[in-house]
A protein has these predicted regions:
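Conserved non-cysteine loop/helix-boundary elements of the Radical SAM core domain that shape
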Residues: 58-83, 88-250
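Flexible, acidic/Gly-rich N-terminal and inter-domain linker regions that tether
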Residues: 1-40, 48-49
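C-terminal accessory regions of radical SAM enzymes
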Residues: 250-266
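Local cysteine-cluster metal-coordination motifs and their immediate loop/turn environment
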Residues: 42-58
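Divalent metal-dependent hydrolysis catalytic cores, especially in the metallo-beta-lactamase
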Residues: 39, 52, 93
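Short, charged low-complexity linear motifs
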Residues: 34, 41, 249-253
């Protein structure tokens, strides 16, 4: 147990160091390598409200700031096309990419005009699974990933997501209604919340199997230097021994046995 905790600490420290970004002197990307496939990642860093556990690059949504940002994204896409880059796959992450649905659609349409795009992937939140948005995303996005995190109302309240995105039951119903609009609808979940019990974890797995999604991704709750204090105030202190135990429970329920709910990919 002690050796595992030490290894976890070392790996997390190395990851933090590796992922620290520094300015580069170049003012343009290197030219594309002929014959090499490329994927375009588009980051939309805006959220309507910021979750206390999230350590990704994100900012509170302001309409004009977001529109200026999307315009800059599209200009950079034109620069990439002029430089000779081509992309068959586009992934839009955040933040909340659907925070300004019309700007997102315009950006995706431009990507398809500039490049030979075969597939677009995007993230979203449950409150954007509404007919108006789904109609606009249908055909533009093939694979949608919905940040659910948990169907448990108690955990949703702790995460400050209950009022923003609805109850677990409401989210469950929205996923079922949204799934037919996409080739693949993924549900993003988090495990190892300090107050999460095995019963809550198992209940989340059962709801995933029944909600109509095509796949699911479970990630352990990640604590960064930027979020540690806020997370401990709001959610409590993390237990990495429980994280390991919960991982094995998830692996057995979702991908183990003779009739697994999902095919294990990673």
């Amino acid at each position: 147990m002690l050796s595992e905790r030490m290894l976890t600490t070392v790996v997390r420290a190395m990851t933090d160091k590796t992922l620290t970004l520094h300015p580069v002197p170049e003012d343009a990307l290197p030219d594309p390598v002929p014959g090499r496939p490329y994927t375009l990642y588009v980051h939309v860093p805006f959220c309507e409200r910021l979750c206390p556990y999230c350590s990704f690059n994100r900012f509170p949504y302001r309409e004009q700031r977001a529109r200026d940002y999307f315009q800059a994204l599209r200009q950079e896409m034109r620069m990439l096309a002029a430089q000779g880059y081509d992309f068959e796959s586009v992934y839009v992450g955040g933040g909340t990419p659907t925070v300004d649905i019309d700007e997102l659609c315009e950006t995706i349409d431009l990507a398809r005009d500039l490049f030979h795009v075969k597939e677009v992937n995007s993230e979203t939140n449950p409150n954007h699974l509404i007919p108006e948005y789904l109609d606009k995303l249908h055909g533009r996005i093939q694979r949608l990933s919905v940040g659910v995190q948990s169907f448990d109302d108690g955990l949703l309240r702790q995460m400050d997501r209950y009022q923003k995105y609805g109850s677990g039951e409401e989210i469950f119903e929205r996923i079922g209604e949204a799934a037919p609009y996409f080739e693949s609808l993924n549900v993003d979940m988090i495990f190892n919340f300090p107050t999460q019990t095995e019963d809550i974890l198992i209940s989340d797995c059962e709801k995933i199997a029944l909600c109509g999604c095509h796949q699911t991704t479970f990630s352990p709750l990640y604590q960064s230097h930027a979020t540690t204090r806020k997370m401990e105030q709001v959610l409590g202190r993390m237990d990495y021994d429980k994280e390991r135990r919960f991982y094995h429970i998830l692996d057995e329920i979702l991908a183990g046995g003779d009739a697994p709910f999902f095919e294990r990919r990673t």
